[in-house]
């Protein structure tokens, strides 16, 4: 009988593994003898067939490793491996299990020539722009049918109502620092744009200066402005949020930057910029979601406004690198998606004053496979609604509000960079009840958005392009 157990390695030499040993080494030394070098099983059962005899949740697997089962020949690993190392093994097993399960799966691959089938709707892809864009980041829709697209390098481009890329870009934009993952990122129209003309931009604000050795030093942090476009010129600029220069970082990672508007407020994200514990520090903007009036003033009812040690614009904290932010049109609930490290990408329900845990708790580990933390939950810290292991590199988020795909109405569309996919999540009573991959292997999905025409617009990186999803065969 093939029991699904995490069995002991034959022989106890070399069991004490250094904390920074990579997870593949931990597995090879302590687990492969019974479960196979490829997780296929042996004395112990397979770890990739999905048939868990003693509970298949992450907590169950962690407990099986830590506590063992002497009757079935498994040594308790607690005291030999640290909690962090055991947690990294759980993530590693999940990655390999997912890899095995995905083999042979026929994902809905988009095509401009053929119809792509999904559970509820069939569609085809129409390419609007496949030449001329350079690292597009976000899209916004003007009332006259034109689209605005940001390019990470600092340009704001226009796509005509006919779907052609205008060769001229907008002049006079604020200077953005194109460095690492940062640059010109988010663009959004004020909800009353037709009356006031305001357009909001999120970008890496900072400086490039030579140090005393003549080497260029770059320091930046995410900032938000608004302005108006007249002809091809950016005018009437106002700062909505510009962090004090003392908060600028030389890191090139984790800028965040997405916007949501609601009832006169703007919500926006600043990533933790690689300073992990800064996400827990209310005196710093890193790793926070902000809520301000749409003119940049601080609301009097913000959760930390009376805390003298906190930045008053902070709405929530403990975030790593959110690159998706969206509001449910049915009830006004706000959700974010944020990149985990290796594993642990998250979808969170955003509620005022709450701590989302990074980096104290996470469902991921370091990119190099070394352990990070040994706990995934802690009192006073929020759990994600769902998390993805392995990571899909969540980026771009929108509730479908159009009428072209009626069976997807109010479903949440989640883009993925690394996995090159869009997932459709059904949310009921603020819980995820199902998810489906509806778009796969057509480029790194940077942004996904419902257009005013009801079609779904997608920006991809790698092959930089703008495409849209059109119903077919319904």
Question: What are these model-predicted stretches?
Answer:
Residues 38-42, 48-98, 184:
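Extracytoplasmic electron-transfer domains, predominantly the class I c-type cytochrome c fold
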Residues 11-26, 255, 311:
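Electrostatic cytochrome c docking/interface patches
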Residues 219-232, 282-295, 350-351:
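Beta-propeller blade signature
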